[in-house]
Amino acid sequence: MANRSTETSEAAIRRFAQLVRTGEVEDYSGELRLGIDLGTANIVASVVDADDRPVAGGWVHSTVVRDGIVVDWLGATTAVRNLTQDLEARLGYEFTAASASIPPGVGGATATIFRNVVEAANLDLTELVDEPVAAARVLGMTDGAVIDIGHGTTGVSVLDHGTVVLSVDEPTGGHHMTLVLAGNHGIGYDEAEALKKDPASQRLVQGVIRPTLERMATIAATAL
């Protein structure tokens, strides 16, 4: 991936978010590349051109991954296949391969399952990369640390001249915030999730989830 300035990286991220949200596609020419992120809350597919310019994206809410582990292989495969087919229809382009991101520090068995999911969706896997490392590439980082707070886990990767020298992943994320809110207020999970995302409730929510946030900070501090 070509190096980007911080401003260019942030613009690309904002544009990709808009493409995912609206379903729009950019004009393109030449070869396109597909990336798959199997997350705890969502499965996201991204498409870029040869210059790493965002062209399209898609997502689906999913519960097939839990704390970085695939718990529903068939559901994960179906979701990846459906996302790919939707992008192909919108772009008029056929994908035969994809790269995928995995939680940092996972064992070989988990990595193999992620690989099998992509390949079962009729895609050749070109690369399997740690999620924080994928983020570092987008940001053009070669040295430093990336902290990835997901729905199910908090991951930390440390890079030295582009090489990963440390990678950890611990089961504390947005999902755990929601559980704490649900228990504190005596409400269901879905209602707690909506409360967590409501900007008007930010002050109320922050006090309740503070211990979870501190746990995430401890994970990062211990890794670093």
Language-model segments: residues:
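Nucleotide/phosphate-binding catalytic cleft detector across ATP-hydrolyzing
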Residues: M1-T40, V44-I149, H161-E170, G174-L224
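A structural feature that tracks compact, well-ordered secondary-structure segments
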Residues: G155-S157
